[in-house]
Amino acid sequence: MAEAAPMRVLVLDTVMDRGGAETMMMNYLRHFDREKITYDFLVNRDYRAAYEDEIEALGGRIYRMCPMYPQYFGRYKREFRAFLQQHPEYRIIHSNLEERSYFPLRIAAEQGVPVRIAHAHNRPVGFDLKSIFREYFRMRLPKYVTHMFACGTEAGDWLFGEKNRNKVIQQRNAIDTSAYRYDPSLAIKVRAEFGVTDPDTFVLGHVGRFFPQKNHTFLIDIFAEVHKQCPN
């Protein structure tokens, strides 16, 4: 008797480069029992991104569609509807498109896809012309979602509204801590790259975009307190 094929979840993302949400999804994919479940990705960029080779090596598939810019909204809706009609095997859709999840998940609901996940990874800061679209889409999104995921309370409140807080699943970002285990030989190499020759110098590092959501002011406050105790 032939073994059952794995359940294939369709993940919607802009591009599978090394962003936070994309890295989180890759961590899940790497640790799944891929004989039972796997991810396929529908992206909105036409270039080969950082994670695509690994996705395919792990058995995932990459599909491409037009960008989700305002001038392409009509085209995107037509193409996504046609895609679902051509791929009825997808019974679970996991969207990382924030408020833009409104488009594909509404179409997925119309096409009878039973599990439609919207995942909030962020909350916008400030107001610009895009904010008008964001507000329109996010207010209509919950109607077409079966499962609401969020990385934290603020992100969930923004995308789904505070009234839906009790429905939101706090999906904390999974991290393979073994990748960050202290390695003395690697530490020596990195310190040398930055010209830190004194072995008694305490070194702290941070990787992150200079955006408000990364909360650099809090990191600076922490560093100030650390520096008081370790002035070297």
Task: Give residue spans per PLM region.
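N-terminal strand-loop element at the rim of the active site
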Residues: E3-M7, V11-G19, T23-R75
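Short hydrophobic "strand-cap" motifs at the C-terminus of beta-strands
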Residues: L12-D13, C151, Q171, H206-F210, ...
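A conserved mid-protein helix/loop that constitutes part of the nucleotide-sugar donor-binding site
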Residues: G19-N27, F202, H206-E225
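A conserved nucleotide-sugar
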Residues: K36-Y39, D198-T201, H216-N232
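Donor nucleotide-sugar binding/catalytic pocket of nucleotide-sugar-dependent glycosyltransferases
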Residues: Y63, K143-L186
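Short His-centered aromatic/hydrophobic patch
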Residues: S95-S101, A120
